[in-house]
Amino acid sequence: SVKLENARILITNDDGYSADGIEILTDIAKEFSDDVWVVAPEHEKSGASHALSFQNALNLKEQADKLYSIDGTPSDCIAIGISHVLKDKRPDLILSGINSGCNVGEDVTYSGTIAAAMEGLIRRIPSIAISQNYEAGKKNLISWDSSKHFLKGILTDITNVGWDSNVFMNINFPYCQSDKVKSIQITTQGNRDTDDLIINEVENNLF
């Protein structure tokens, strides 16, 4: 189990350090602890999966107190966050998100949000990936209501119980208002319909 009160929490995402989701997650984390740090990509890195920037030098920028950006991937952010930004004391917990869009089924293999939690797992730190689904085609109108309403309680419950050190947690919120959520379910990873995995050619040889 993880004691959230006064825990050292490292937060990242794949939507960028100024994205709405990571700001919401940071605010929720700060309800548990003052020792909350954000190290996140300077620009959106959705679909980066578990890539590490071996070929490029990375620029770490302090954007505000305990808020850093890196011109790299979410996994870069976890690696540098642990080894440099928080080198005096490792984080007790890693939170990755809140992602714009769900991370379920085979999509988890593409996700930078998921990969950041996996990087934390590799480094033997309890890690949780968090995603907020939205209605198809309405990413700009995403509602964070269910995340805001339920996440604090879910984090409290799962960290109190704890989980196997060889797994990370993956939380997904539906795109309905919180009063429409019927239950919270613990489940296993499923499969998606691959018929929509089509890459369209918009112009000649332009995809």
Q: Which residues are covered by each model-predicted region?
A:
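Short glycine-rich anion-binding loops that position phosphate/pyrophosphate groups of nucleotides
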Residues: 15, 44, 73-74, 99-102, ...
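Short beta-strand segments
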Residues: 12, 39-41, 96-99, 129-131, ...
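Electrostatically charged, flexible surface regions
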Residues: 142-207
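Glycine-rich phosphate/pyrophosphate-binding loops
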Residues: 121-143
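Alpha-helix C-terminal capping segments
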Residues: 81-88, 115-126
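Glycine/threonine-rich flexible loop motifs
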Residues: 102-111
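Short acidic, Gly/Ser-rich segments with clustered Asp/Glu that frequently serve as metal-coordination loops
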Residues: 15-23
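A cross-family phosphate/adenosyl-ligand binding-site feature
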Residues: 3-9, 23-84, 88-90
